[in-house]
Amino acid sequence: MAFAVSTACRPSLLLPPRQRSSPPRPRPLLCTPSTAAFRRGALSATTTPTPARAALPSTTGRNRIVCGKVSKGSAAPNFTLRDQDGRAVSLSKFKGRPVVVYFYPADETPGCTKQACAFRDSYEKFKKAGAEVIGISGDDAASHKEFKKKYKLPFTLLSDEGNKVRKEWGVPADLFGTLPGRQTYVLDKNGVVQYIYNNQFQPEKHIGETLKILQSL
């Protein structure tokens, strides 16, 4: 009987190791990586996209609000900028006739060159409508002069360095604020905005759309 008791006790001594090996080990292993991840900042990679995504819509949202600065039916704000020859030109100078003011990203870029040449090729139609065409970008006067000469542009190019007028008029940027917007305004002879057209990636469409409006004034 003494031997039977001793053999019965031996299995009971083996039970504690079994309990230690199964429940406690998974629990620490599951908890340790997550806390370590927070301490080491390993989760920063997952949290970084969240603010980035939130920031992008906020810039586009600001642009939409700014876009309301000059709207259809409002009087276009006057400005004075330097032309391709360095002369000061004011918008008020053209009062008494329709004016097409088109903002574009930059000289010598593919889309802007197409747009400028399309305005050039249809310039006689604008003259028949009694309208003046003015192109505005952030390039300096020297860049405008070269651009105008190279493509034989018959209309005025104005230098808005620092994009002051662009901001005052509320021209919205594209690609989350990284690309200056391409926007055209049609003003009647009293300087009132009759039409606003925005199309960054089809620059030549600006010409046909603005001519339709001019011919109806």
Curated annotation (Swiss-Prot):
<comment type="similarity">
    <text>Belongs to the peroxiredoxin family. BCP/PrxQ subfamily.</text>
</comment>
<dbReference type="GO" id="GO:0005737">
    <property type="term" value="C:cytoplasm"/>
</dbReference>
<keyword id="KW-1015">Disulfide bond</keyword>
<dbReference type="GO" id="GO:0009543">
    <property type="term" value="C:chloroplast thylakoid lumen"/>
</dbReference>
<dbReference type="InterPro" id="IPR050924">
    <property type="entry name" value="Peroxiredoxin_BCP/PrxQ"/>
</dbReference>
<dbReference type="InterPro" id="IPR000866">
    <property type="entry name" value="AhpC/TSA"/>
</dbReference>
<dbReference type="Pfam" id="PF00578">
    <property type="entry name" value="AhpC-TSA"/>
</dbReference>
<feature type="disulfide bond" description="Redox-active">
    <location>
        <begin position="112"/>
        <end position="117"/>
    </location>
</feature>
<protein>
    <recommendedName>
        <fullName>Peroxiredoxin Q, chloroplastic</fullName>
        <ecNumber>1.11.1.24</ecNumber>
    </recommendedName>
</protein>
<keyword id="KW-0150">Chloroplast</keyword>
<keyword id="KW-0809">Transit peptide</keyword>
<dbReference type="InterPro" id="IPR036249">
    <property type="entry name" value="Thioredoxin-like_sf"/>
</dbReference>
<feature type="domain" description="Thioredoxin">
    <location>
        <begin position="70"/>
        <end position="217"/>
    </location>
</feature>
<comment type="subunit">
    <text>Monomer.</text>
</comment>
<dbReference type="GO" id="GO:0045454">
    <property type="term" value="P:cell redox homeostasis"/>
</dbReference>
<feature type="transit peptide" description="Chloroplast">
    <location>
        <begin position="1"/>
        <end position="66"/>
    </location>
</feature>
<keyword id="KW-0575">Peroxidase</keyword>
<keyword id="KW-0560">Oxidoreductase</keyword>
<dbReference type="InterPro" id="IPR013766">
    <property type="entry name" value="Thioredoxin_domain"/>
</dbReference>
<comment type="function">
    <text>Thiol-specific peroxidase that catalyzes the reduction of hydrogen peroxide and organic hydroperoxides to water and alcohols, respectively. Plays a role in cell protection against oxidative stress by detoxifying peroxides.</text>
</comment>
<feature type="active site" description="Cysteine sulfenic acid (-SOH) intermediate">
    <location>
        <position position="112"/>
    </location>
</feature>
<keyword id="KW-0676">Redox-active center</keyword>
<dbReference type="GO" id="GO:0008379">
    <property type="term" value="F:thioredoxin peroxidase activity"/>
</dbReference>
<dbReference type="GO" id="GO:0009535">
    <property type="term" value="C:chloroplast thylakoid membrane"/>
</dbReference>
<dbReference type="GO" id="GO:0034599">
    <property type="term" value="P:cellular response to oxidative stress"/>
</dbReference>
<keyword id="KW-0049">Antioxidant</keyword>
<keyword id="KW-0793">Thylakoid</keyword>
<keyword id="KW-0934">Plastid</keyword>
